[in-house]
Amino acid sequence: MSLFNTENTWAFVFGLLGNLISFAVFLSPVPTFYRIWKKKTTEGFQSIPYVVALFSATLWLYYATQKKDVFLLVTINAFGCFIETIYISMFLAYAPKPARMLTVKMLLLMNFGGFCAILLLCQFLVKGATRAKIIGGICVGFSVCVFAAPLSIIRTVIKTRSVEYMPFSLSLTLTISAVIWLLYGLALKDIYVAFPNVLGFALGALQMILYVVYKYCKTSPHLGEKEVEAAKLPEVSLDMLKLGTVSSPEPISVVRQANKCTCGNDRRAEIEDGQTPKHGKQSSSAAAT
């Protein structure tokens, strides 16, 4: 009995620490949304991370309702659902119409359609411990997909030998969070809570190791300038997509200026070759007037 009480005590300690760290992670976008509220525009930010976070918190909250003695798992995911709903509501209020429509489609497809399908199937087709196992398996699968997202960043760091796109503080926080929730899952002997955090800890530790290795490196000595830019292409493309709805006039004006310069060079080349420049009569009449 003493061993059982000790395990519950450790589960409470790790669960409480996990709640505190996860609260901080959930609140980290507050400055971003304060700026959105103040400027009344989303400035090209995307809603995908918040829609995914809401779906993840909803799944884990549903899993927690099927288990006993996991109150701290309920509290953090209930808070996650609450705060992510606020973020998404603010995004919908200030986003341009295309981004707003995309967000609504994702919410209907993933958060409403996907979750309702899981809820109905699990409630009517399976019962008892089997239901908790199936929901836990779904949560693990989704969490593994979310944890695998930083792999593209890790690839970029290795290829460019630059940690520009991998903040150390965020990697450290997420690694500590994964360790705490891993210990919480082990204390509860819950493989569905523990397993995805093993992967989260491994990826977080790898990111910190890469940060130490490449901290003072800017670019790879084995990569040319074009290859470095190619390695950064996903981030650059994302930035271009985000800025496309806000600053489209600038690229257009640049293209026009480039066309003017090209036309000017063509005219000079024609004059040097002794050919009559195109639009010569129009230019003369304009000069005469």
From Swiss-Prot:
Membrane side Extracellular: residue ranges: 1-9, 65-70, 127-133, 189-192
Matching InterPro entries: SWEET, SWEET_rpt
Residue span, MtN3/slv domain: 12-98, 134-218
Entry superkingdom: Eukaryota
GO cellular component: plasma membrane
Residues recorded with modification Phosphothreonine: 276
Cytoplasmic-facing ranges: 31-43, 92-105, 155-167, 214-289
Tissue specificity annotation: Expressed in leaves, especially in phloem. Expressed in developing seeds.
Induction info: Slightly induced by the pathogenic bacteria P.syringae pv. tomato, the powdery mildew fungus G.cichoracearum, and the fungal pathogen B.cinerea.
One example of a Gene Ontology biological process annotation: protein homooligomerization
Chain positions covered by the region annotation Disordered: 266-289
Cellular compartment(s): Cell membrane
Molecular function as annotated in GO: sucrose transmembrane transporter activity; sugar transmembrane transporter activity
Description of the deletion phenotype: Under high-light conditions, plants lacking both SWEET11 and SWEET12 are defective in phloem loading and display slower growth, mild chlorosis, and high levels of starch and sugar accumulation in leaves. In plants lacking SWEET11, SWEET12 and SWEET15, severe seed defects, which include retarded embryo development, reduced seed weight, and reduced starch and lipid content, causing a wrinkled seed phenotype. Altered sucrose efflux involved in the transfer of sugars from seed coat to embryos thus leading to starch accumulation in the seed coat but not in the embryo.
Keyword annotations from UniProtKB, A to Z: Cell membrane, Developmental protein, Membrane, Phosphoprotein, Repeat, Sugar transport, Transmembrane, Transmembrane helix, Transport
Family in the record: Belongs to the SWEET sugar transporter family.
Function of the molecule: Mediates both low-affinity uptake and efflux of sugar across the plasma membrane. Involved in phloem loading by mediating export from parenchyma cells feeding H(+)-coupled import into the sieve element/companion cell complex, thus contributing to the sucrose migration from sites of synthesis in the mesophyll to the phloem. Contributes to seed filling by triggering sucrose efflux involved in the transfer of sugars from seed coat to embryos.
Complexes and interactors: Forms homooligomers and heterooligomers with SWEET1, SWEET3, SWEET5, SWEET6, SWEET7, SWEET8, SWEET9, SWEET12, SWEET13, SWEET15 and SWEET17.
Protein name in UniProt: Bidirectional sugar transporter SWEET11
Organism: Arabidopsis thaliana (Mouse-ear cress)
Taxonomy of the source species: Eukaryota, Viridiplantae, Streptophyta, Embryophyta, Tracheophyta
Gene that this sequence comes from: SWEET11
